[in-house]
UniProtKB/Swiss-Prot annotation:
Gene3D superfamilies: 6-phosphogluconate dehydrogenase C-terminal like domain, NAD(P)-binding Rossmann-like Domain. It comes from Lactococcus lactis subsp. cremoris (strain MG1363). This is Prephenate dehydrogenase. Belongs to the prephenate/arogenate dehydrogenase family. It catalyses: prephenate + NAD(+) = 3-(4-hydroxyphenyl)pyruvate + CO2 + NADH.
Amino acid sequence: MKKILIIGLGLIGSSIALGIKKAHPEFEILGSDREEVENIAQKRGIIDSKVELVKGAQEADIIILAVPISVTLELLKQIATFDLKDGLLITDAGSTKSEIVELANQLFSGTKVKFIGGHPMAGSHKSGVMAADLNLFENAYYVLTEESQELRELLKGLHAKFIILDAKEHDKVTGQVSHFPHILASTLVWQSDDYAKEHPLVKHLAAGGFRDLTRIAEADSLMWTSVLLSNPEITLERIENFKKHLDEIALKITKRDSQAIEHFFEEGKKIRQAMEIHKGALPNFYDLFISVPDEKGVVLRVLALLQDFSITNIKINEENREDIHGQLQISFKRAEDLQEAREIIEKATDFTVV
């Protein structure tokens, strides 16, 4: 019987465990975490048994590290000192890859232990073992730093989209689309809070646009500190690049260059619309935003058009904003459903759909 050791039974680790158990009920899932977390995971059937780190690592055929980056680095150093099985495969679930892969390659060079970096690009506003979700990774990108049929087979129950990406390129890409946006969100919150000291209405008038831009500022502070310190060069380079773009639009405003400013927004809109927005560290939904009039029955009218679809979530934005009258957000699990729903709504109504 193949034994899988999962170290870290939070949202990611426990959700991975559920996916493995679904696809491979014959495998034994060992779990290592704090005792109270292990007990919950075992009681809920997420793991088959709890195990002490050394014993579990020595018995395991595959080890999955689902812990913060700094902890992953320390665990790799510990595990490398254990008497491990020949052919052991180790992977992780960290948000950066270069530092982890480089250390693992140093530690296991010349051994029969194989390390392949992993990054399931999925998450939730919930956390911990109680938030374990079998469907968390469905249709989400799952990055591997090397091709591995063994990992693909192990994790097939997650129904994720596996892509192979060099560790350094991974950190460059995620540095732009994942790490840097968290800096922007928190910076905007800090800036607004500071500005509100002289202009108190800032906090009252911050509406949908501000909320959407800053939502990720509520993310785990310890985790994101670890992420940034594991990818500092790319992070700093992206900050400098962003300063350059801000300076460019500032110059356009200074010159009162309306044509250039309009081009700035128009091109930004086109680029955004052309992007295939997938899940990053957020729920794996494909969101449709519908601007609707403030009329009785309008929401039911839209939902009636979509009665044959599998809808993951519905959110009604009741705020009155100068740029959007009212907004209905409908989330789908599949991109195909989103596109079909968009076409149906655009054909049956005159509502703006984005």
